[in-house]
Amino acid sequence: MLFRSEGAFQQVSDAADLGTAIHSALEAHFKGEQVPEGYDAYVYPVSCLIEREGIKLLEHELRLVNTSDGYAGTTDAVFTDSIGFNGILDFKSRKTKPGQPCTPWETEPMQIAAYCVAKFGSIRSNATGANVYISTTEKGRVEIVKYSTTQLDEAWNAFQAALTLWQYLKGYKPPFHEGPTH
């Protein structure tokens, strides 16, 4: 039993390492740098998808901080879409199965919404967001899931609830929180 669980932990570690390497290769590509050998099979399909979708990446690996709500994170990209909406894009490596679509995990739209608010100050009427899923089991397979302003607004509300719960459980108060004082 111990041997099997060690193997499972190794698989998780290997998957995380591959995801990190794919992210690094994508970052290199979009900065105009050399893509590490062996990663073109992941990078090229993503580049083609982004071009086909009319997405223009404006900033890469951007650290975002929301001091009033008390959270921070690093987004993969800030972008403009084909109709001029600004948004947040995050790459996700994922094991996929042939014929089954990539669907966001529950927290992924919340992450995009939180980054939108940290970057732009709110979920504006022209906000957009997307996750680009890169298959680690079907080389060359990439899919995009886009989020509308309505979806981002709902995800932001969910994120705020989760953040409030986390802050309560951890006894954390944002240093610049502008809420009521008791």
Predicted regions and their residues:
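Metal-dependent nuclease catalytic cores that hydrolyze phosphodiester bonds in DNA/RNA
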Residues: 1-72
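Mg2+/Mn2+-dependent nuclease catalytic core
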Residues: 62-169
